[in-house]
Amino acid sequence: MIRIGLRLIAAMMALGAMSVGATAQQADDPDLVAAAKKEGKLAFYTSFLGAPFHIAAIKSFEKKYGISVELLDVRASELRERIRTEQAAGRFIGDVIQNGAATMIRSQRDGELEPHGGIANAKRLSGEQKATDVLVPSYILAYGILVNTAKVKGEDEPKSWKDLLDPAWKDKILSDDMRALGGGQVMFSVLEDAFGRPFHEKLAAQQPIFSRDVGNDERRVARGEYPLRIPQLFSNTTILKGLPVKLIIPVEGVPYIRFDMARLRNAPHPNAARLFINHYLSDEVQLIYANAGLIPVVPDLGGAIKEEMRALTSAKLLGTTNVDTQDAMMALAREIYK
């Protein structure tokens, strides 16, 4: 009896220890929900360009709270200009914005955002991804290497970013343009920080073929026109399922962009905005992201993630862009990759 009791106590203590660090989803504040429902709607500004998993996240909010979401979904550069124009004219239409972290920091510095007033589910964020009183992480876009499995044998697959320097890949690397904003520039910055300029000089000597037509370039690799492509968005790889391609996660880790959310200055529906941002840190939305090949910012979602997505969502993060060095990095890329 005593032994059984001791074992039971030990098991309960172990279970309690396992739960430490995994903060449960926070209960909705009934006053916030009531105020948000009274506002009835919100305007959401983003640049995911119709990706179905993003639409699913929006619909989950509308279904749960009965609050409609008016969506502005345009390219990042167009989005930034839209906000500048509206706010300069004193027309405050948008409530919530979601964009890359570096761009969001610029928006905050330019006075385009305001404090969100508290997000209960921010307590759930992983230790590496922290919220501020203005910016709240929502998900992570990560990049690896795409290879054509018919052209590249298993033993020849690049396991490291440095494997791209192998002479066998000369004139055979299809790459997003590192000299312009986008995935290529993110990769350039992160690998410059990790390996230094000599790495890029050697990679430039491989004569990578630059392009900015992401969807078509992925298909070119699938067709066998090129054996590999860098950098490859994790989430885009899911679209290529059934084709002779494979995503490689290099041993050093992967470049990434974190997408943050914030309330726009003088948001006309501030309570709905807070509730919306909070919803994006719920299990429901984080699992939508995880099962689409994005990395969630809330840990311990565990068994609900599809088996084929677990390697992607648990990939080691190598680094991301720095808003204060972004322009210098772009200039350096143009200098090295002529």
Describe the function of each predicted region.
Residues 57, 199-202, 259, 268-280, ...:
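Short amphipathic alpha-helical coupling segments at ligand-binding clamshell hinges
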Residues 303-338:
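Extracellular/periplasmic bilobal clamshell ligand-binding domains
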Residues 102-108, 222, 226-246:
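A ligand-binding cleft/hinge motif common to bilobed small-molecule-binding domains
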Residues 28-43, 47-68, 145, 239:
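Short, polar/charged alpha-helical segment
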Residues 45-58, 70-87, 91-225:
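Extracytoplasmic ligand-binding site segments that recognize negatively charged/polar headgroups
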Residues 144-151, 188-189, 257-269, 288-289:
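A bilobed periplasmic-binding-protein/Venus flytrap-type ligand-binding module shared by bacterial periplasmic
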Residues 126, 140-143, 169-179, 201-204, 210-211, 280-302, ...:
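Periplasmic-binding protein-like
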